[in-house]
Amino acid sequence: MSSSALTCGSTLEKSGDTWEMKALDSSRLVPWPPRGLGSSTQHPNKPHCALASCQGPGVLPGAASALPELTFQGDVCQSETCQRYLQAAISLDIAVSQINLLGRPSSPPALLIQQGSCEQVIHNSTPQFLGMEDGDNERTTGWLWRLCEDIDAEPSSTGCSRSNQLTFTEGCFVRSLSTVYSNTHIHTHL
């Protein structure tokens, strides 16, 4: 009685100033809570976290939602001494089935991106699943753009390890996931 969790192996490649990390795998998700067991007010993987706060606005607490977790990580190495600005584009290729699990209006999934200990709920995120109906099983691709300023430590050849976790709160499963890291070097002139 828990959601599916999958850790993907990843590859990291460099082309110019762009690091590209791809994690390809398939994860089939388990609805939570199981039908017939009544409402649940806790996230299956985070007992201290209520569903309402984990799922964000617009998702009813206790609804039968799939709560998958897909974790990928890699090292972004940088040898220049400068500020680093990291722009991450996350490409999602997902399949959707039975979005409207409990008669709720079909809507895009609320997507929770967790980076380290920081959590950010992205509302109105792509993909939008436009024109899809209950029971449809289609694939779509969307992009999520984030700009991160990384000045916590001086860049070094040892690299900076990053781990991201994607949590979907609707009935869908991830087909593939790829992330592109672009490093822009900003030099300070004294």
Curated annotation (Swiss-Prot):
Expressed in testis. It comes from the Eukaryota. This is Spermatogenesis-associated protein 12. It comes from Homo sapiens. The lineage of its organism: Eukaryota, Metazoa, Chordata, Craniata, Vertebrata.
